[in-house]
Amino acid sequence: MGKIIGIDLGTTNSCVSILENGNVKVIENAEGARTTPSIVAYANDGEILVGQSAKRQAVTNPHNTLFAVKRLIGRRFEEDVVQKDIKLVPYKIVKANNGDAWVEAAGKEMAPPQISAEVLKKMKKTAEDYLGEPVTEAVITVPAYFNDSQRQATKDAGRIAGLDVKRIINEPTAAALAYGMDKAKGDHTVIVYDLGGGTFDVSVIEIAEVDGEHQFEVLATNGDTFLGGEDFDMRLIDYLVDEFKKESGMDLKNDPLALQRLKEAAEKAKIELSSAQSTDVNLPYITADATGPKHLNVKISRAKLESLVEDLVKRTIEPCRIALKDAGIDASKIDDVILVGGQTRMPLVQKEVADFFGKEARKDVNPDEAVAMGAAIQGAVLAGDVKDVLLLDVSPLTLGIETMGGVMTALIEKNTTIPTKKSQVFSTADDNQSAVTIHVLQGERKQAAQNKSLGKFDLADIPPAPRGVPQIEVTFDIDANGILHVGAKDKATGKTQSIVIKANSGLSDEEIERMVRDAEANAEEDRKFEELAAARNQGDALVHSTRKMVADAGDKVTAEEKTAIEAAVVALEAAVKGDDKAAIDAKVEELSKVSAPVAQKMYAEQSAEQP
């Protein structure tokens, strides 16, 4: 059996990890970095770029560069947060046939799980390159406050990427696992405050020693799935746009190219201001008008940035308060505060958290890597490589059904330990009612319409009877991934109907299978493209080095040699512009052959000059 890898599929960055010889190892990607930007771009020549290469070309290709797609995963197009996002991103967010939020790039409409799958494929390949063997199984993390549709969509993304997702686990819980594995024995209660690129979670977790086993029990969780570093960047972008408008009278909001440059600059300035007191944002040629090019130069102090985002930081405190209340614990009883997510590097965030909990956060947990490390530990637990860990997570939101009068009746309360199963008996609302619709909801509001609809199904052929007589038993069953299975049974006839909640949206099995096939077909295409790109690069490099060599050689090159080399160079340049790898290889060989005598002359001369 192969290794089960741990993947932190983040809004801004992703990370992959593995447990090896009892130690957790974060795996560097092909570029040598321990985290990979969660960015996917579709280049004009059809190449799909993922990570740093996608980020680098974002400025010149803003409409086809997709970032922060995790904020759309498992969401309906009509949701307020999606409508808000449409105004903020340079790429197109569109309404799919099933009402979900999809994205459009390179003239194609795609589901968010397809985009996330590209990032997961990169993480999978990173692990395979390191291990030297195929990887087919993974534990993937999600924000603790993700609802059922978002969890299901994340699982779908794994499937499209060719991964068997063994478990979906909550990010704060994973971070606690990474933190708690090497701690001294004994019981302690920790807070994991996770402010990432797009989401915020807080979990109260009790780490206990039970019969020689490390037990991690989540007591309560809360959060906001649309609050993170991207919002902090946006505040800074808005400020820069306003400052530029005051100075030049020009609005950069309608210029996708300028916005993409501003996004990069804002992210960079925000990071710099975590260690410096001030920084300059200097963007020459940001735009132009009839009078000529315009340059943006704005000085930003740490205090200015803090004033721009203060309310966002304050917004994270209320979920902390609710989580403590739900866990029945006072802030003074918390032993350790663990900060996770890149945005927690901001001094203002650290100060607010320390003020609220009355203690400084620990500094020995890497905020970018802890979640992936915890996922790898959970993978090792599932593989049987780690025996002394028990993880007890919770369902983050209340689950129930719609009952008479549009009321939501709860079956499983929020913060219930999972896996769990609950049943309740309901009846009919009308005389001789022959069918009931089970409308499954998730949320904390009493009014059914105010909660997230997860799906509907019918239990039909109920024998005629006065209202209130039939007994319909509804069962909710949440698995260890936090994914819900619902069943309904007519107790008189024994007739049952059940569904795995796929939401009234989400991807069908057929769609996922098609996307898996597309991904497999693309893999072969990608391989050919990589080979062609490598051949082109080799050709370009040879043209450059040959021309330089001829120039350096001067009159040591005969007219005959010069003519032959120039003809071979022109032929290779023409081949490089085409799509035929074999033709490029042939012209490379030809140029190497005709330039070899000159190279030998130069080498002989250099050797003679050396003492």
Swiss-Prot record:
InterPro entries: ATPase_NBD, Chaperone_DnaK, Heat_shock_70_CS, HSP70_C_sf, HSP70_peptide-bd_sf, Hsp_70_fam. The keyword Phosphoprotein applies. SUPFAM superfamilies: Actin-like ATPase domain, Heat shock protein 70kD (HSP70), C-terminal subdomain, Heat shock protein 70kD (HSP70), peptide-binding domain. Keywords: ATP-binding, Chaperone, Nucleotide-binding, Phosphoprotein, Stress response. It comes from the Bacteria. GO terms for molecular function: ATP binding; ATP-dependent protein folding chaperone; unfolded protein binding. Induction: By stress conditions e.g. heat shock. The modification Phosphothreonine is found at T199. PANTHER family: HEAT SHOCK PROTEIN 70KDA. Acts as a chaperone. Belongs to the heat shock protein 70 family. This is Chaperone protein DnaK. It comes from Pseudomonas putida (strain ATCC 700007 / DSM 6899 / JCM 31910 / BCRC 17059 / LMG 24140 / F1). The gene is dnaK.
